[in-house]
């Protein structure tokens, strides 16, 4: 399949995708309720989409094309409320979080779709281990070349996005020590990591065709990059976030990405360069391991500071962009979270320490999602 042309889209519009956990109310383990929930929701009126994922223990909700933070918040809230209402008759719980705290990957089944069955056949057990839950944010770009500029410019802020959304401290009943253990599952795939440093669509098309001719990939879907262009939508897709525990935080993070994109496209505070990636993997690891307490190394100045402080250092520059986009409340929430340094991973650990029961932790995560 050749690379399709980059579709024209309205700059700085955005969309949000959230992968959610489906658990039974008996022991709060993952359960394959997606087909039942989708049947219960058939005919429900809402913007956006609700659809199955790689495992029937997951479900994805996504907004339409959003122009504002408030629109995204309203669309996701409506879908959340519809799903929560439908879940009651199914004795089903729905939760955010990047990983389920104690599910066993070997118990999972793969959804019966050609794409997911292909992934299972190609990647073996990695497909079942990929029962993790992420937030993806699409940002509309004014042109194909601008999409690549934005992809690499916003790459500097990947540690922000990871740390702000981190909600996966537990894997198979064990505290991993990570704030976001989910990304370790993604890293096992061969085409994961960061996109190649290319700044023109002609160069990117040549790269894509070369990779396709090797047989390594067939389409853009085979790239599991942290940020990837989506030519069929005219967007870039930021893919590093765990699914937060609440719709509110998911929308705050999406709005933060949108305002950063506006700042980078209009102000051009720097030009991306290959050397930006010298510290990329280190910064990303710090965000995964330590969350907002992790260290951020500036790629040019080589100074070090906590990720939370680096977030706070950019907030003032984002104020006019947040104001123009109608997302000042989201910026205030992001600033407050960075000041507190107590994200969702911290909340999950605190609940687990008090309850001494991961089942109870999942139950309370379901309550958080429904609130």
Swiss-Prot record:
For the protein in the UniProt heading, the enzyme class is ligase
- Keyword Transport listed? The answer is no
**GO function terms (MF aspect):** ATP binding; glutamate-cysteine ligase activity
* Reaction(s) catalysed (UniProt annotation): L-cysteine + L-glutamate + ATP = gamma-L-glutamyl-L-cysteine + ADP + phosphate + H(+)
- The residues forming a coiled coil are none
Task: Write the record's keywords in alphabetical order, separated by commas.
Answer: ATP-binding, Ligase, Nucleotide-binding
Gene3D superfamilies with a match to the protein in the record: 3.30.590.20
Q: Which domain of life is it from?
A: Bacteria
Database matches in InterPro entries: GCL_type2/YbdK_subfam (IPR050141), GCS2 (IPR006336), Gln_synth/guanido_kin_cat_dom (IPR014746), YbdK (IPR011793)
Q: Under which EC number(s) is this enzyme classified? A: 6.3.2.2
Biological process according to GO: modified amino acid biosynthetic process
Pfam families, from UniProt?
A: GCS2
Q: Does the keyword Nucleotide-binding apply?
A: yes
What family does this belong to? Answer: Belongs to the glutamate--cysteine ligase type 2 family. YbdK subfamily.
Protein role: ATP-dependent carboxylate-amine ligase which exhibits weak glutamate--cysteine ligase activity.
- What name appears for this protein in its UniProt entry? Putative glutamate--cysteine ligase 2
Q: What is the scientific name of the source organism? A: Cupriavidus taiwanensis (strain DSM 17343 / BCRC 17206 / CCUG 44338 / CIP 107171 / LMG 19424 / R1) (Ralstonia taiwanensis (strain LMG 19424))
């Amino acid at each position: 399949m050749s690379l399709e042309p980059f579709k024209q889209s309205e700059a700085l519009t955005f969309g949000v995708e959230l992968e959610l956990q489906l658990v039974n109310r008996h022991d709060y383990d993952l359960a394959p309720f997606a087909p039942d929930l989708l049947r219960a929701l058939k005919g429900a009126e809402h913007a956006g989409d609700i659809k199955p994922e790689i495992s029937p223990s997951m479900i994805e909700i996504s907004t339409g094309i959003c122009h504002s933070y408030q629109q995204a918040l309203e669309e996701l809230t409506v879908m959340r409320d519809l799903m929560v209402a439908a879940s009651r008759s199914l004795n089903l719980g729905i939760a955010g979080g990047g990983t389920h705290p104690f599910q066993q990957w070997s118990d999972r089944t793969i959804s019966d779709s050609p794409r997911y069955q292909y992934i299972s056949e190609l990647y073996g057990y990695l497909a079942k281990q990929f029962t993790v839950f992420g937030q993806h944010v699409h940002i509309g770009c004014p042109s194909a070349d601008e999409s690549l500029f934005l992809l690499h410019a916003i790459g500097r802020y990947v540690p922000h996005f990871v740390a702000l959304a981190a909600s996966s401290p537990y894997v198979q009943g064990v505290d991993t020590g990570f704030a976001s253990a989910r990304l370790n599952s993604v890293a096992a795939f061969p085409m994961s990591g960061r996109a190649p440093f290319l700044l023109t669509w002609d160069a990117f098309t040549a790269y894509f065709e070369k990779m396709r001719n090797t047989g390594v990939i067939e389409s853009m879907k085979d790239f599991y990059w942290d940020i990837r262009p989506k030519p069929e939508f005219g967007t870039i897709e930021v893919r590093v976030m765990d699914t937060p525990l609440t719709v509110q935080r998911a929308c705050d993070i999406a709005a933060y990405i949108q305002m950063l994109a506006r700042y980078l496209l209009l102000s051009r505070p720097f030009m991306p360069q290959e050397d930006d990636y010298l510290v990329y993997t280190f910064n990303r690891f710090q965000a995964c391991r330590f969350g907002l307490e992790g260290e951020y190394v500036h790629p040019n100045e080589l100074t070090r500071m906590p990720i939370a402080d680096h977030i706070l250092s950019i907030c003032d520059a984002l104020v006019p962009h947040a104001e123009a986009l109608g997302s000042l409340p989201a910026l205030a929430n992001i600033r407050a979270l960075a000041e507190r340094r107590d994200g969702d991973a911290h909340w999950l650990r605190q609940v687990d320490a008090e309850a001494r029961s991961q089942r109870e932790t999942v139950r309370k995560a379901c309550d958080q999602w429904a609130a």
